[in-house]
Every structure is written in structure tokens, then in C-alpha cells.
Regions:
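Short, solvent-exposed loop/turn segments at secondary-structure junctions
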Residues: 38-40, 59-61, 82, 105-108, ...
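Short hydrophobic/aromatic-enriched beta-strand-loop microsegments
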Residues: 73-78, 150-152, 302-306
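Active-site-proximal region of nucleotide-activated glycan assembly enzymes
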Residues: 154-155, 161-186
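Conserved active-site segment immediately N-terminal to the catalytic lysine
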Residues: 129-167
Length: 359
């Protein structure tokens, strides 16, 4: 039976793929668990005790905010068309005692290990922070450069009311818990699930209000908040290997369905190996805004650029600006199966053939 809608916030806790056998893998013991990825960055900012960070122009305001709240200066570096970093630009903008933040966009390596090692051995006292939100659960085969800290948002991967992680040798921040944010999100998730079962629009509207209120709480909180124990228990009970396998299966089906448009140049894959991440199928298309509007009209909610360009980064990088204007993140998460992917892809193909205009 066709669903009322597709996409949006991960809310269906029944799709979280709990462990079914005795082989439960525990969350790594060196992970510090926080309410959100933003809280993990806030904790890092306090532990690092620096004053300036250099991050890619292709990022979102939620990555900038924790450092601004901590009184840091935030600067941005350019990216190349393949989403690797412009190492010349980075070298020219880095200052002594800076923090260099980098991330693997859907599994794409931003720097060579040799470049990072050269910065570490330069005597400039640079700290390295890797954001692994896009590939936190994917197996990594490189065992080279080890950053000073790794952070990630876990809420993008499963229906988790709370979820952020930090791994670092800089110490442990003594964060307190505050369940208001997670409890609001949990209530919103439950109402969203009921809405999809009953079609009661009042439940949907109330869920939206609670998500919005929770987001406001997260943004105004300047201090790091630790993950509450009940949500840590939920996180530790999830089989992320199964979740990643489900996402990759859906990715393969989407690529198979979209292959003719990819061959014709109507759809451009942002990476040739999206399975290295599994977060979304990231594509670049013309008329992205009109295509997305028509998807929404059909109740198919695929995010646009998942990093709306921060105002502070405007004009820094033409690649970042292009991606922000043309990217569509096609959902592939574990709530759905291959039949759902067929429905989503068929609608996307139909819309693209009309240039994003309603059929």
C-alpha cells in the first residue's frame, strides 16, 4: 500500500533495525555521546581551547554556530569540483594554533594523508577535527592520518531523539543532561507515526511544532549537553550494519532506475561511489528548486543541499555555491524498500522530463 508521504525527519523507531541475535556490537568505548552533533562540537570547542577554526565553505550553519557561541573566529576554505579540498587555499588561510575541520562528503576524501601530515609536522600547532557524519558507520580501509578529534551527528542515520558523538584524546567534557530536547523529539516522532497510520493532519501539525520547538532549544543552548541514558540505551541497541546494508540496497536500486538520465546528462552523481557513505544518493540537477517543489506537492520530501550555505561563507567558493543551488539528496534510508525506491525514482524521472513543472 502506498504511503501517505515519503521522506522528512527519521521518525519511525520501528525502522531502527534492532539487534536480533546475541552478536550485539557495543558503541565504541572511546565515544563521548552527546545530545546532538552540535553539542559534540560545543564540547570540542571547550576541550580544544583555541580561538579560530578553518572549515570548508560547503557546510551548514549548525556547524558554525557552536564555535561562534564559544567566541571563535570562523574562516572558510575552497573546494575543488570533485569536493576534495583546495590544499593551496587551505595552506594560505591556516594560521598558527588554528583548528582545521574537514569532512568526507559522502565518503570523498578531502585531503591526502601526506598533506595532513605535512601540516602536523610544520610546527604551527594545528589541531585536526574530522566530521564523519556522512560515513560514520561505513568501514574505512585507510589507516593513515589520525585527527585530534572526530565528531558526527547520529540522528541523520536512525530515528534517535538524541544523538551526537565525539572521539578525542583532548579529554572529556563534564557535560550535564537535559532531556527537554530529546523528549520533545520523541513525542514528535510518535505523533508522526500515528499521523501516517491514521491520516489525522492535527497530529502532523503538532509534530511539526514540537520539532521546531526542539530545534529552538538546541540552538539557544550554548553549553554542551550529554546524551540522556534512555536515548543512549536506544542507540546501543541498534544494528547499524543492517541499517547501512538496507540503505546501500536502496541506493543500488535508485542508481539502476536513474541510469538512463545519468547517461543522458540530466542527472549527475556527486560521487561515483555513494555506497561509501549510504546517507543519501546525492545528485546535481538543473531547475532543482522547481523539481523539489513538485516533489513536495507529491509528498515526496527529499532535502535539497543538506548544507544551506552559511551567510559567512557566501562568495568564498564557486563550487560550494553551485552545489547549494543544484544538489538534491534523494532519500534511501531503512524505512523503505526497493518498491518504494521504484516509486520515488519514477516520480523523479517524470518530474525531470517536464523540467520540474506540474504534470
Amino acid at each position: 500500500m502506498r504511503k501517505i508521504e515519503y521522506g522528512g525527519e527519521l521518525f519511525d523507531m520501528s525502522s531502527n533495525r534492532p539487534f536480533t541475535g546475541a552478536d550485539q556490537k557495543l558503541i565504541p568505548s572511546d565515544w563521548q555521546l552527546y545530545r546532538s552533533g552540535r553539542d559534540a562540537l560545543r564540547a570540542f570547542a571547550r576541550l580544544a581551547d583555541r580561538k579560530r577554526i578553518l572549515m570548508p565553505a560547503l557546510c551548514c550553519s549548525s556547524m558554525v554556530l557552536p564555535f561562534r557561541q564559544s567566541g571563535w573566529e570562523v574562516a572558510f576554505y575552497r573546494l575543488k569540483p570533485d569536493l576534495s579540498a583546495d590544499e593551496t587555499d587551505v595552506s594560505g588561510k591556516l594560521r598558527n594554533d588554528d583548528v582545521l575541520l574537514y569532512m568526507r562528503y559522502f565518503g570523498i576524501r578531502p585531503f591526502s594523508d601526506a598533506f595532513l601530515e605535512s601540516l602536523r609536522s610544520s610546527g604551527r600547532s594545528i589541531l585536526f577535527l574530522e566530521d564523519r557524519t556522512h560515513d560514520i558507520w561505513a568501514e574505512r580501509f585507510d589507516s593513515g592520518f589520525r585527527p585530534d578529534a572526530v565528531a558526527a551527528s547520529l540522528r541523520k542515520w536512525a530515528a534517535l531523539p538524541e544523538g551526537g558523538m565525539l572521539r578525542t584524546d583532548l579529554g572529556t567534557y563534564p557535560a550535564e543532561t537535559d532531556t527537554r530536547y530529546g523528549d520533545l523529539r520523541r513525542e514528535a516522532m510518535e505523533e508522526k507515526s500515528c499521523y501516517l497510520e491514521t491520516g489525522d493532519e492535527r497530529l502532523n501539525l503538532d509534530a511539526r511544532e514540537k520539532y521546531s520547538h526542539a530545534e529552538q532549544l538546541l540552538n539557544i543552548s550554548a553549553k554542551p549537553i550529554r546524551m540522556a541514558s534512555q536515548y543512549e540505551t536506544l542507540l546501543c541497541g541498534l544494528d547499524f550494519t543492517a541499517i547501512l546494508e538496507a540503505r546501500r540496497r536502496n541506493l543500488r536500486r535508485l542508481i539502476e532506475k536513474l541510469a538512463p538520465l545519468i547517461e543522458d546528462g540530466i542527472v549527475h552523481l556527486m560521487t561515483g561511489t555513494p555506497e561509501n557513505s549510504g546517507l543519501y544518493l546525492p545528485i546535481l540537477i538543473d531547475n532543482r528548486d522547481s523539481v523539489q517543489r513538485e516533489l513536495i506537492r507529491r509528498r515526496l520530501y527529499c532535502p535539497a543541499a543538506i548544507w544551506p550555505e552559511p551567510p559567512e561563507a557566501s562568495g568564498v567558493c564557486s563550487v560550494s555555491h553551485y552545489v547549494t543551488e543544484h544538489m538534491l539528496s534523494v532519500l534511501c534510508d531503512q524505512r523503505y524498500n526497493e518498491t518504494d525506491m521504484d516509486y520515488l525514482a519514477d516520480n523523479l524521472i517524470d518530474i525531470l522530463k517536464t523540467g520540474g513543472n506540474p504534470a
